[in-house]
Amino acid sequence: MSATAATVPPAAPAGEGGPPAPPPNLTSNRRLQQTQAQVDEVVDIMRVNVDKVLERDQKLSELDDRADALQAGASQFETSAAKLKRKYWWKNLKMMIILGVICAIILIIIIVYFST
Protein backbone atom coordinates (compact mmCIF):
# COMPACT_ATOMS: atom_id res chain seq x y z
CA MET A 1 0.00 0.00 0.00
CA SER A 2 1.17 3.45 -0.71
CA ALA A 3 1.35 6.33 1.71
CA THR A 4 -1.07 8.42 -0.35
CA ALA A 5 -3.78 5.80 -0.11
CA ALA A 6 -3.66 5.95 3.66
CA THR A 7 -4.15 9.74 3.78
CA VAL A 8 -7.21 9.83 1.50
CA PRO A 9 -10.41 10.01 3.53
CA PRO A 10 -12.82 7.13 2.99
CA ALA A 11 -15.60 7.68 0.47
CA ALA A 12 -19.07 8.61 1.74
CA PRO A 13 -21.65 5.82 1.58
CA ALA A 14 -23.93 5.87 -1.45
CA GLY A 15 -27.06 8.03 -1.13
CA GLU A 16 -25.69 10.30 1.60
CA GLY A 17 -25.17 13.49 -0.25
CA GLY A 18 -27.68 15.51 1.83
CA PRO A 19 -27.63 16.94 5.33
CA PRO A 20 -25.88 15.03 8.05
CA ALA A 21 -27.88 12.34 9.83
CA PRO A 22 -29.29 13.25 13.24
CA PRO A 23 -27.41 11.92 16.19
CA PRO A 24 -28.42 8.35 17.11
CA ASN A 25 -29.76 9.60 20.46
CA LEU A 26 -32.42 11.78 18.75
CA THR A 27 -33.44 8.94 16.44
CA SER A 28 -33.86 6.54 19.35
CA ASN A 29 -35.86 9.17 21.28
CA ARG A 30 -38.15 9.64 18.29
CA ARG A 31 -38.61 5.88 17.97
CA LEU A 32 -39.30 5.66 21.68
CA GLN A 33 -41.93 8.41 21.41
CA GLN A 34 -43.56 6.68 18.43
CA THR A 35 -43.59 3.38 20.28
CA GLN A 36 -45.03 5.07 23.38
CA ALA A 37 -47.74 6.69 21.24
CA GLN A 38 -48.59 3.30 19.76
CA VAL A 39 -48.70 1.75 23.24
CA ASP A 40 -50.98 4.56 24.45
CA GLU A 41 -53.27 4.02 21.46
CA VAL A 42 -53.42 0.27 22.12
CA VAL A 43 -54.13 0.91 25.82
CA ASP A 44 -57.00 3.25 24.90
CA ILE A 45 -58.43 0.68 22.49
CA MET A 46 -58.15 -2.03 25.14
CA ARG A 47 -59.94 0.18 27.69
CA VAL A 48 -62.77 0.72 25.23
CA ASN A 49 -62.90 -3.03 24.57
CA VAL A 50 -63.01 -3.83 28.29
CA ASP A 51 -65.83 -1.31 28.75
CA LYS A 52 -67.74 -2.91 25.88
CA VAL A 53 -67.21 -6.38 27.37
CA LEU A 54 -68.50 -5.19 30.75
CA GLU A 55 -71.56 -3.61 29.13
CA ARG A 56 -72.16 -6.80 27.17
CA ASP A 57 -71.87 -8.86 30.34
CA GLN A 58 -74.40 -6.62 32.07
CA LYS A 59 -76.81 -6.87 29.14
CA LEU A 60 -76.41 -10.65 29.05
CA SER A 61 -77.09 -10.82 32.78
CA GLU A 62 -80.26 -8.76 32.35
CA LEU A 63 -81.31 -10.94 29.43
CA ASP A 64 -80.71 -14.07 31.51
CA ASP A 65 -82.87 -12.65 34.32
CA ARG A 66 -85.64 -11.84 31.84
CA ALA A 67 -85.40 -15.33 30.36
CA ASP A 68 -85.69 -16.87 33.83
CA ALA A 69 -88.76 -14.73 34.58
CA LEU A 70 -90.28 -15.71 31.24
CA GLN A 71 -89.61 -19.38 31.96
CA ALA A 72 -91.29 -19.08 35.37
CA GLY A 73 -94.27 -17.34 33.76
CA ALA A 74 -94.51 -20.05 31.11
CA SER A 75 -94.50 -22.78 33.77
CA GLN A 76 -97.21 -21.00 35.72
CA PHE A 77 -99.26 -20.54 32.53
CA GLU A 78 -98.88 -24.21 31.65
CA THR A 79 -100.05 -25.27 35.12
CA SER A 80 -103.06 -22.96 35.13
CA ALA A 81 -103.98 -23.97 31.56
CA ALA A 82 -103.94 -27.65 32.55
CA LYS A 83 -106.14 -26.93 35.59
CA LEU A 84 -108.57 -24.94 33.45
CA LYS A 85 -108.70 -27.72 30.86
CA ARG A 86 -109.45 -30.29 33.56
CA LYS A 87 -112.10 -28.03 35.08
CA TYR A 88 -113.96 -27.61 31.78
CA TRP A 89 -113.60 -31.31 30.97
CA TRP A 90 -115.41 -32.16 34.23
CA LYS A 91 -117.98 -29.46 33.56
CA ASN A 92 -118.60 -30.88 30.09
CA LEU A 93 -118.84 -34.41 31.50
CA LYS A 94 -121.43 -33.25 34.07
CA MET A 95 -123.48 -31.60 31.32
CA MET A 96 -123.37 -34.78 29.23
CA ILE A 97 -124.48 -36.86 32.21
CA ILE A 98 -127.32 -34.44 32.96
CA LEU A 99 -128.35 -34.46 29.30
CA GLY A 100 -128.24 -38.27 29.29
CA VAL A 101 -130.36 -38.45 32.44
CA ILE A 102 -132.91 -36.01 30.97
CA CYS A 103 -133.08 -38.02 27.74
CA ALA A 104 -133.50 -41.24 29.74
CA ILE A 105 -136.33 -39.70 31.80
CA ILE A 106 -138.08 -38.45 28.66
CA LEU A 107 -137.65 -41.85 27.03
CA ILE A 108 -139.06 -43.61 30.12
CA ILE A 109 -142.03 -41.21 30.18
CA ILE A 110 -142.72 -41.85 26.49
CA ILE A 111 -142.46 -45.62 26.92
CA VAL A 112 -144.74 -45.60 29.99
CA TYR A 113 -147.27 -43.29 28.29
CA PHE A 114 -147.52 -45.35 25.10
CA SER A 115 -147.41 -48.73 26.78
CA THR A 116 -150.59 -48.23 28.76
From Swiss-Prot:
Phosphorylated by PRKCZ in vitro and this phosphorylation is increased in the presence of WDFY2. (Microbial infection) Targeted and hydrolyzed by C.botulinum neurotoxin type B (BoNT/B, botB) which hydrolyzes the 76-Gln-|-Phe-77 bond and inhibits neurotransmitter release. Nervous system specific. A higher level expression is seen in the brain as compared to the spinal cord. Expressed in hippocampal neurons. InterPro entries: Synaptobrevin-like (IPR001388), Synaptobrevin/VAMP (IPR016444), V_SNARE_CC (IPR042855). The record marks 58-60, 66-67, 76-77, 81-82 as: (Microbial infection) Cleavage. The chain crosses the membrane at residues 95-114. Residues 92-116 are annotated as: Required for interaction with SEPT8. Keywords: Acetylation, Cell membrane, Coiled coil, Cytoplasmic vesicle, Membrane, Phosphoprotein, Synapse, Transmembrane, Transmembrane helix. It is found in: Cytoplasmic vesicle, Secretory vesicle, Synaptic vesicle membrane; Cell membrane. Part of the SNARE core complex containing SNAP25, VAMP2 and STX1A; this complex constitutes the basic catalytic machinery of the complex neurotransmitter release apparatus. Recruited to the SNARE complex following binding of the SNARE complex component STX1A to STXBP1. This complex binds to CPLX1. Interacts with POPDC1 and STX4. Interacts with VAPA and VAPB. Interacts with WDFY2, PRKCZ and PRKCI. Interacts (via N-terminus) with KCNB1 (via N-terminus and C-terminus); stimulates the channel inactivation rate of KCNB1. Forms a complex with WDFY2 and PRKCZ. Involved in the targeting and/or fusion of transport vesicles to their target membrane. Major SNARE protein of synaptic vesicles which mediates fusion of synaptic vesicles to release neurotransmitters. Essential for fast vesicular exocytosis and activity-dependent neurotransmitter release as well as fast endocytosis that mediates rapid reuse of synaptic vesicles. Modulates the gating characteristics of the delayed rectifier voltage-dependent potassium channel KCNB1. This is Vesicle-associated membrane protein 2. It comes from Rattus norvegicus.
